[in-house]
Structures are given as structure tokens and as C-alpha cells.
UniProtKB/Swiss-Prot annotation:
Function: Nucleoside triphosphate pyrophosphatase that hydrolyzes dTTP and UTP. May have a dual role in cell division arrest and in preventing the incorporation of modified nucleotides into cellular nucleic acids.
Taxonomic source organism: Pyrococcus abyssi (strain GE5 / Orsay)
Protein name per the record: dTTP/UTP pyrophosphatase
Tagged with keyword Hydrolase: yes
E.C. designation(s): 3.6.1.9
Length: 187
């Protein structure tokens, strides 16, 4: 059985397209002493996977952590609408990185990696930002946006894996199979 160590409906949807999965969110302290954003994303993904693996040692565990980085500043999940507005204003007209660290545990093997996707936002008007905030789609999303939803109209271009920006790179599934992890395909 594949267990997704996340409460993210986006990750559940992506992984669930390929495999029958169970969801068991990890309850970890999401602080990290890692020096770089990539190291932080990988560290948190690994912590999530290991926490869930301790409960389900005979299953395949998939975990991920996604962060948005603009000019070296990590833009996490906003705690308020005001904070979301500030993040969107910062991202307006700029290129930023979406970094997802992932970790897979199967039969004692621990495999992790990092994917980075560049995203360029068009210039966002104050009215557009206010409208987006009113949708409440910004809640619980790194960088205050979900590319798969209303915020898709913010994007001028993307370089890299679209699903990485959503929260789980397709590469995770490919790595899972390529490395000999043999979960049952979805019927």
C-alpha cells in the first residue's frame, strides 16, 4: 500500500491518479535548521516520511514539502489575508522558484530529491489581487497561490514541472517505479 504523508488535497489528487493510496498526514514540527531552501524542503519531506513510516513500516511512504522562493526569501503559507496580499504584491511581475522536496520510503530504502520550477507572474493589479483574496484560494498554500486554480491567470510562463508547482512532481511517481518500488497500479 502507498501512504501519502500529507493532508494536501492536491498531492492526494496527483498521486491518486496513478495508484490506490491511503492518506495519513504527518504531525511534525515544520521548523528546519537547513541552510538553503532546497535543503529545507528535502529535510521537511524526509521528516514527514519518517514520522509516518514509524506507524506503517511495511508500506510505501511518499512525502513532500513545497516552498516558494523569491530573491532568496522563502514565502511560506500565509497566516492571514494581509500576509497573503503582501506575498502576491511581491510576486507580481517577477520570476520566482517553486521548490519541492520529496522523500519515498519502501522496504527500508529511503530515496529523496528536490525539484525546482521557475514561474513568472504577470503584473498583478490591486483589483486582481483583491478579487483573488476574496476567493480564499490563497489559504494553506505556499506563496499564497494555487497555480491549478484561479491563480492560473497570474502566470506569464513556467519553466519546469507544472505538477511540482501544484505540490508533487510527477518525477516522484517515476522515481518510485524506476527504483524498483512495485506498488500496485490503480485499476
Amino acid at each position: 500500500m502507498i501512504i501519502l504523508a500529507s493532508s494536501s488535497p492536491r498531492r492526494r489528487e496527483i498521486l491518486g491518479k496513478f495508484f490506490d493510496i491511503k492518506v495519513y498526514p504527518s504531525e511534525i514540527d515544520e521548523r528546519s535548521n537547513a541552510r538553503s531552501p532546497k535543503e529545507r524542503a528535502l529535510d521537511l519531506a524526509r521528516k514527514k516520511a519518517l514520522a509516518v513510516h514509524s506507524r506503517f513500516p511495511n508500506d510505501t511512504i511518499v512525502a513532500a514539502d513545497t516552498i516558494v522562493v523569491l530573491d532568496g526569501e522563502v514565502l511560506g503559507k500565509p497566516k492571514s489575508e494581509r500576509e497573503a496580499r503582501v506575498m502576491l504584491e511581491k510576486l507580481s511581475g517577477k520570476v520566482h522558484s517553486v521548490i519541492t522536496g520529496y522523500c519515498i520510503i519502501h522496504n527500508g530504502k529511503v530515496v529523496g530529491g528536490v525539484e525546482e520550477t521557475k514561474v513568472k507572474f504577470r503584473n498583478l493589479s490591486e483589483d486582481l489581487i483583491e478579487w483573488y483574496l476574496s476567493t480564499e484560494e490563497w489559504k494553506d498554500k505556499a506563496g499564497s497561490y494555487g497555480i491549478q486554480g484561479y491563480a492560473s491567470i497570474f502566470v506569464e510562463w513556467i519553466q519546469g514541472d507544472y505538477y511540482n508547482v501544484v505540490g508533487l512532481p510527477i518525477k516522484v511517481v517515476v522515481e518510485l517505479i524506476k527504483l524498483g518500488f512495485k506498488p500496485r497500479p490503480k485499476r
